[in-house]
Amino acid sequence: MGHEARYSKDTFQTRLQWQDLDPDYLRQLVGLAKIEDLAGAGLANRPERLGDVTTALMPEGAKGKAQLTAREPLTICGLGLVQTTLESYGQNCLFEATAEDGQSLDQGDTIGILSGSSTVLLQAERVILNFLQHLSGVATETRLYVDALGKSSSVLLDTRKTLPAYRVLQKYAFACGGGYNHRIGLFDRVMLKDNHLAVAGATGGNRLSETIALAVNTCENIPVEVEVDTLEQIIPALDAGADIILLDNFSLPELKQAVSMIEGRAWTEASGGITLDSLSDLGDLGLDFISTGAPIHQSRWKDIGIDWL
């Protein structure tokens, strides 16, 4: 930085760990998935017959063992949800993982072994797979984006473009893929975006500087980030003491000019229209951060199977 920054770069490149997630909240998500499957939760008219009518035909008290297997190369994520899901259906099943979240697996690799009540295993298998396939898809796609940046000093961040109620899981998956987490919600950073500036009548000039300065002075212990969509907004943002300047939908030449203008007076972040193909060029510009929600909202579920042993 060209001046004494209020916050180090490390402040803005954190990763959610599994222990950061609230187990009670995760149990609620699993519980919703369970009653959706067994009792038609979400339907205005609940079914008269509840439960798993197919598994009810299986031998009572039967025990079983099954293997979780990667059916294609992937970065695994969500293993902590497997035991939580089993326990939601019953107390007599065990999951023994042979991989760990964030690990890259090849086709055919074993992820873990499920054992216990056949009834519980049969009822829970689709919910388990839904979580693992989705979160592993996010982690795998994120890994591709991180790899595309290569040895660049630019740090890949996620966004708040997440499925409602699943944010912490999707951000955790992004971290498992090697990315870093942007703000978790509206509570942990002041982020003046274009609509905030429009409401404040502060899209440029002195009014823009005054609005940013008010945020910096009022929120002394909270980082202040400002989204700009023109080069002309950069100097007022710098003069007001913004901690991070988000360069929204700038072209490559504009980004290069913006980095030169900012000259280390604030941390820089590029966002908008970020693709795998553009990352190598973006990584050469000297940007501090590159943020994209694509690995979360454009990822494909990965093929994972549960096979009876």
Q: What is each of the regions a protein language model found here?
A:
Residues 2-225, 229, 233-240, 244, ...:
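Acidic/glycine-rich phosphate/pyrophosphate-binding loops and surrounding catalytic core
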Residues 249, 272, 294:
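Short secondary-structure boundary segments
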Residues 305-309:
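Active-site loop ensemble at the mouth of alpha/beta enzyme cores that anchors a bound cofactor
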